[in-house]
């Protein structure tokens, strides 16, 4: 699949997830077979551009793979400025967020709230596309509510504005993450526009990935929550798409190696004073399958020292072996 002049190595993309798809996680997903990994959402508000939080969320020129930054906001001029700043710092693709269902984002008329205002959507898309000389993509939901699904209208508008790829999550904003994603709307959009369409939502295993690709005709898949604690899902899916066969479960020793490396990267990236806090949620996700009771996770979450976290994980896996 191509986005502008960029050729992805495969059709699997790691979704932007706030507080999760930071630089260490993006690099891990890339190493585990993702064709591209999108950054955490960055606000277009200029008041926060120079904060430590925004600085850490920005991509860096030495990152592996295609550097794709997602921005969010509701002011066309601010969005254009945010796009220019991120391109100057190394972004090779700009993704616009019009799919986030979070209340704090929607209250500011950003994220999926914008789907209720096609005229403003057009202004934002046009402003960003005209502001930068890199491909601009868009991520949306199927609409604001099941009664107001307008993804076909938004998709046509996006194509006319020069958007070069469109990701659609198969739920409306009012659905949040409840129920099951539906793919009829994604299929309808794919049959309507000529730009690449990326399907997103509830793609949890290789069989589901194959089924969604076949049903929707999508050009690619975006995987989010299913990669939490299981970044090797990209490798599993790609192997199945290529061969029709499932890979064996990840050996416990390999899980330990990946987890240890991920936690060390988090400690290095955020510093010892913050890295150990960020590491807690990732460890919890990794160990869901291997720690059915919460005792170790509760013990681990009480640790407030980076080196002690690594020692605790080593001891934990030794006991499992």
Swiss-Prot record:
Active-site residue numbers: 100 (proton donor)
* Residue numbers binding FMN: 16-18, 70, 139, 200-202, 224-225
Tell me the enzyme class: oxidoreductase
Source taxon at top rank: Bacteria
Query: What would you give as a GO molecular function for this chain, any one?
Result: FMN binding
- List UniProt keywords, sorted A-Z: Flavoprotein, FMN, NADP, Oxidoreductase, RNA-binding, tRNA processing, tRNA-binding
Q: Which InterPro entries match?
A: Aldolase_TIM, DUS-like_FMN-bd, DUS_fam, DusB, DusB-like, tRNA-dHydroUridine_Synthase_C, tRNA_hU_synthase_CS
**Is Flavoprotein included in the keywords of this UniProt record?**
yes
The family database entries (Pfam families) matched by this protein are listed as:
Dus
User: What does the sequence similarity comment in the record state about its family?
Assistant: Belongs to the Dus family. DusB subfamily.
**Function recorded in the entry:** Catalyzes the synthesis of 5,6-dihydrouridine (D), a modified base found in the D-loop of most tRNAs, via the reduction of the C5-C6 double bond in target uridines.
Q: What's this protein's name? A: tRNA-dihydrouridine synthase B
State the organism of origin. Yersinia pestis
State the taxonomy lineage. Answer: Bacteria, Pseudomonadati, Pseudomonadota, Gammaproteobacteria, Enterobacterales
């Amino acid at each position: 699949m191509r986005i502008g002049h960029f050729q992805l190595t495969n059709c699997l993309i790691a979704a932007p997830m706030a507080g999760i798809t930071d630089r260490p996680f993006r690099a891990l997903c890339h190493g585990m077979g993702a064709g591209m990994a999108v950054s955490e959402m960055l606000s277009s508000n200029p008041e926060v551009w120079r904060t430590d939080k925004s600085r850490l969320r920005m991509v860096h020129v030495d990152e592996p793979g295609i550097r794709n930054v997602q921005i969010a906001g509701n002011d066309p001029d601010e969005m254009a400025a945010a796009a220019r700043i991120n391109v100057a710092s190394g972004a090779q693709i700009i993704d616009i967020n019009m799919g986030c269902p979070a209340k704090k984002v929607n209250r500011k008329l950003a994220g999926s709230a914008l789907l209720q205002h096609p005229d403003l959507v057009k202004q934002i898309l046009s402003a960003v596309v005209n502001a930068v000389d890199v491909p601009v993509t868009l991520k949306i939901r199927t609409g604001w509510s099941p009664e107001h699904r307008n993804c076909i209208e938004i998709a046509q508008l996006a194509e006319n504005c020069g958007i070069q790829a469109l990701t659609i999550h198969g739920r409306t904003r009012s659905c949040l993450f409840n129920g099951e994603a539906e793919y009829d709307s994604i299929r309808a959009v794919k049959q309507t526009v000529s730009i690449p369409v990326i399907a997103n939502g509830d793609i949890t295993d290789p069989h589901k990935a194959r089924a969604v690709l076949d049903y929707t005709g999508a050009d690619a898949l975006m995987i989010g929550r299913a990669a939490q604690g299981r970044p090797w899902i990209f490798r599993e899916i790609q192997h199945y798409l290529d061969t029709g066969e499932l890979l064996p479960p990840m050996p416990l020793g390999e899980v330990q190696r990946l987890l240890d490396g991920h936690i060390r990267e988090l400690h290095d990236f955020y510093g010892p004073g913050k890295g150990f806090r960020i590491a807690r949620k990732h460890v919890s996700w990794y160990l869901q399958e291997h720690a059915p009771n919460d005792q170790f996770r509760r013990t681990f979450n009480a640790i407030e020292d980076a080196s002690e976290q690594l020692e605790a994980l080593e001891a934990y896996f030794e006991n499992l072996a």
